[in-house]
Amino acid sequence: MSESLSGKWALVTGASAGIGRATVLALVEAGAKVLATGRRKAELETLAKQCSAQAVEVIAGDLNDAAFVAELAARAGNVDIMVSNAGVLTYAPLMDMTFDETEEMFRTNVLASYRVTHAVAKAMMERRRGHIIVMTSIAAREVYRLGVIYCATKHALSAIARGLRIELQDYGIKVTEIAPGMVDTDIRATSNHPRVLEALKVRKFSPLTPQEVADAVVYAARAERNCCPDLVELRPLGSA
């Protein structure tokens, strides 16, 4: 029997759109209450209105802002599940990437993710329970053309997730990586580089949907108390 999420309190970052938004909806459907955060307040409020009364609370802000993260951690309180999902992506050849684009990806995908996870994990350690779910990527285990910097950020985030799993297990805290392949989200459409557009045209498979990834999050969150799904990899059929 899998664990019920009824009455569980979850925090989802990057919830304004894509995987984060789908994850909020999936967790609510499974019975959890969710604190959803992202940069776009209007989208978060629209998301909350789609859910049953008081199932979703929203707080908009930038995870790169230390003061906001402190406020978010205090608001999250005794959170049972944290889904660290916020991220950015720029597809381009390595030598065409600007330093600003590179810095933004490392700052958001690695440092901001770690900042909020660190704050929430501290509270979980005091209670000696909790589940941290980190959205990494197939890119955490590969390096591919047009996405080298993104791969580097996901390699770093995966290493942090694995380290947290080792250090937090003695406190009864689970850490799971969800590692999807290409997903049909806004983040995938952020580059107009000709080589990127051409590569997308010739692909021979359909990307995963945000809902498919969200279902994997719920699957991991519902694992039996003594079972920790360390890594859940998802690939579009035909993409291997």
Name each model-derived stretch.
Residues 122, 166-169:
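Alpha-helical segment proximal to the catalytic Tyr-Lys
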Residues 32-46:
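Conserved glycine-rich Rossmann-like NAD(P)H-binding loop of the short-chain dehydrogenase/reductase
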